[in-house]
Design a protein with these regions (language model features):
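Hydrophobic h-region of N-terminal signal peptides that target proteins for export
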Residues: 9-18
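Contiguous, structured surface segment used for ligand recognition
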Residues: 20-160
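Active-site mouth loops of central-metabolism enzymes
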Residues: 161-165
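Extreme N-termini of proteins with methionine-enriched Sec-type signal peptides or N-terminal signal-anchor
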Residues: 1-2, 19
Length: 165
């Protein structure tokens, strides 16, 4: 009898040691981006005060920001707003001039926010997809976190297709 009690207590203790923060996202997503460099700094917390910034007058970015906001609401229950005014603690969508592939994107996540940058709207959309996949699926919480990281990705091929032989 004492042996069963000791085994039960040991089992319960081992469960508490392996418990993870279910409100923490992960960059182990499919398909895995070309480069994921996780940082040891503090994660970014998404709360009801978080906003998604898009460039004023850019209707495509505004639509993408709304898409991301609705997904965050759906999977976490946290209502984030979109805005064309910059502030701290935002998820920023940024178009940058550059010579990278049109569908390439980069993400920078730190305690101050998330920046999704690309040379085209398509790249921003794919960056948003990566953020959506990294979010934890949990409901009715006050905040979720994404680990600090630098993520870079681009399509491996210049075309997307499905072939059946």
């Amino acid at each position: 009898m004492i042996r069963r009690i000791i085994l039960t207590m040991a089992f319960l203790a081992s469960l508490s040691l392996s418990a993870k923060d279910v409100n923490m996202g992960s960059w182990q997503i499919v398909p895995l981006p070309q480069q994921v460099k996780e940082m040891s700094s503090a994660p970014f917390r998404i709360t009801a005060k978080t906003t998604i910034y898009y460039a004023a007058g850019d209707e495509k970015q505004k639509k993408d920001a709304g898409f991301l906001a609705s997904h965050i609401k759906e999977v976490t229950g946290i209502g984030v707003k979109t805005t064309d005014k910059q502030a701290k603690g935002q998820i920023r969508l940024a178009l940058n001039a550059g010579d990278t592939q049109s569908e390439a994107y980069s993400l920078v996540v730190n305690k101050n926010g998330i920046t999704i940058s690309a040379t085209s709207h398509v790249g921003i959309f794919y960056g948003i997809q990566s953020v959506m996949k990294a979010l934890p699926i949990t409901r009715n919480v006050k905040s979720v976190s994404l680990p600090a990281a630098e993520v870079t990705d681009a399509p491996r091929f210049a075309y997307r297709a499905f072939m059946i032989d």
